[in-house]
Amino acid sequence: MEKKFLKVGNNINFKFNTDGLEYDLIPGIVYNIIVDRYTDTVSLQESGKLPLPSKVYCTSRDERFIDKVINSYNLSESGFTGVMLAGLKGSGKTVMAKMIANKSGLPIVNIDKNIRPHILRNIVEMLGDTSVCFLFDELDKVLADYDDSFLLQVLDGSDTKGKHMILFTCNDDSEISEYLIDRCSRIRYWREFEEMSPSLIMEVLNDKLNDKKEVKSLTDFIKDNFEVCSFDNIVSFVKEANNYPTTTFEELFEDMNLSSKGTIKPHARSCKENNHKNVKNKLASDDYCWTVC
């Protein structure tokens, strides 16, 4: 099969001329789209592999969903297998998108907010029968300035010779075009991300909390007080708890960029009572100094 790309340094160009080395896109490698702002000429630039945390927290339901997406793509004959991962910010949507992209075994093309939809359509045309996984993070942030008619054309597959996967994430699905919702031919799978379950919270705490005796107490504190139980918020709070082992959960919470469900419900830490007294005495002194100053 004739190669469709040329590599010059780190840039991978569509084969419009004979300069450079012939090149095939590499499975698992991320390519950023480079667009000449004067000519709209498109090239791709290698960007390594998608970074993932050393440990990914994944439920059996998550694993079944990922396997289903991959299997459906493999069974498809042409066009796009579209996936929308929507919902709570900081809940792991981007991590799951990266996991799916890596598991697809396809070259990964990153679409950022600067790539206009007509450019995406042109890329799909130029790819021909070369299959890739497109990754479009936080789609909802760009749709206000985005002509989604081109995106709809792309997802309809009218210009597609090969078969592709396209992964979207969004925090606010109310911003998504009505022409994408309940249209499985365009977006086959739609997964809503909500708060972490108590069992998953406890698993994270068992891994990351230094004082394992506090796992149950901190799990209860999170369930009772966190307005947004996202992975991002929980991991950040655990770091604070590890860094300040004699500070109450309530004080840690009050000082962080976290919203509460209402009046904070205290839960005891496992540190010694005299440590609590020392902290309270220090806080009283600090508060007095702050007031006087």
Model-derived regions, located:
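C-terminal alpha-helical "lid" subdomain
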Residues: M1-V30, R183, W190-C293
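Conserved ASCE P-loop NTPase core motifs with emphasis on AAA+ ATPases
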Residues: E22-K55
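Pre-Walker A (pre-P-loop) alpha-helix and adjacent loop at the N terminus of AAA/AAA+ ATPase modules
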Residues: Q45-V83
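Short glycine-rich substrate-engagement loop in P-loop NTPases that contacts/grips substrate
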Residues: R64, A101-T130, L143-S149
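Walker A/P-loop nucleotide-binding motif
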Residues: S76-A97
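Conserved nucleotide-binding/hydrolysis micro-motifs of P-loop NTPases
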Residues: I115-R116, D140-K141, N171-I176, E195-I201
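Hydrophobic positions in the central parallel beta-sheet of the AAA+
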Residues: F134-D137
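Conserved catalytic/switch belt of AAA+ P-loop NTPases
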Residues: D140-C184
